[in-house]
């Protein structure tokens, strides 16, 4: 698979379960709560630093295997 990349959470809507990550290079990436690794309530906060892999989703590139760093 792809190499891990780093980025920053642009925004995340807890009610809808998705948001966007701004990678260190490239365009913003869609992120779904199912792609967040960890236990419990899966959410991200604006400005959080994250690492992830880029995968092809239904509507283009998106972040997967997201971890807060």
Swiss-Prot record:
Coiled-coil portions: none
Gene Ontology biological process: regulation of gene expression
Location relative to the cell: Cytoplasm
Gene3D superfamilies cross-referenced by the UniProt entry: Nucleic acid-binding proteins
Any single Gene Ontology cellular-component annotation: cytosol
CDD domains named among the record's database cross-references: CSP_CDS (cd04458)
Keywords assigned: Activator, Cytoplasm, DNA-binding, Stress response, Transcription, Transcription regulation
Main localization of the protein described in the UniProt heading: cytoplasm
Induction: In response to low temperature.
Protein name: Major cold shock protein CspA
Gene, per the UniProt record: cspA
GO MF entry, a single one: nucleic acid binding
All residue ranges annotated as the CSD domain in the record: 7-66
């Amino acid at each position: 698979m792809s190499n891990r990349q780093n980025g920053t959470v642009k925004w995340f809507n807890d009610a809808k379960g998705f948001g966007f990550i701004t990678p260190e290079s490239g365009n913003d990436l869609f992120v779904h709560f199912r792609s967040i690794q960890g236990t419990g309530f899966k959410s991200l906060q604006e400005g959080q630093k994250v690492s992830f892999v880029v995968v092809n989703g239904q509507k283009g590139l998106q972040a997967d295997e997201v971890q807060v760093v």
